[in-house]
Amino acid sequence: MTEAEYLANYDPKAFKAQLLTVDAVLFTYHDQQLKVLLVQRSNHPFLGFWGLPGGFIDEHSDQSLEDAALRKLQEKTTVVPPYIEQLCTVGNSHRDVRGWSVTVCYTALMSYQACQIQIDSVTDAKWWPLEDVLQMPLAFDHLQLIEQARERLTQKALYSLVPGFALAEPFTLPELQHVHEVLLGKPIQGKSFRRRVEQADLLIDTGLKRTERGRPANLYRLKSDTASYRFLRNLEC
């Protein structure tokens, strides 16, 4: 039998398939704190519980796992986040009461303002302060996924400007510094942070200014290669 003949007679439904889903931990920065997008479940299991945006793979429209994650996020926010990366894969027999389940989880960042109108117009999606989320009973194992995503983002705050993708552009340097401080849980020396940023050359000066504390502050945008840049030394050095 040739491979073509084998495939012509192959029936994928003859084999029991595990549940395969994607989930996304979407962060933003608003009111000087990190927030996470949660959606309220309208079906069992965990009916009425809050959880991560996500769902099953659509084999007809999704060309990749990331496509599936972006599709689910766009359904809730109407926009595509400027930063997304695969966080982890979790699979076992007990995370979903419907059966053996595998989820591929992504972490993503976007500005609050980018989807504010859409989120404000619905009742089943909401930005929650991260510290509140960590105390909530969530669907499935979503709390553990959020904790893992937070740790990943905290590590990135040490050696990159990735947290800046949670800011609305244009932003000031103090705003960029503060989102790093929120993640690290401690203040960063301002001159040291500015020096790291200038050496990295990852910001575009818009030429605009915003008055903060009586002083005009330059407004910046992130360059396209910001996500891949790593500081030579982390911010704690």
Identify the residue ranges that each predicted region occupies.
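N-terminal strand-loop-strand
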Residues: 5, 9-51
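Active-site segment of metal-dependent pyrophosphate-handling enzymes
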Residues: 18-22, 66-70, 74-118, 130, ...
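Conserved Nudix-box catalytic region and its N-terminal flanking loop in Nudix hydrolases
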Residues: 33-79, 157-178
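NUDIX/MutT-family hydrolases
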Residues: 55, 107-108, 117-153, 166-174, ...
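Short helix-coil junctions and helix-kink-helix linkers
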Residues: 178-187
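RNA substrate-recognition surfaces in RNA-acting enzymes
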Residues: 188-218
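Long, intrinsically disordered, low-complexity Ser/Thr/Pro-rich regulatory/activation regions
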Residues: 207-237
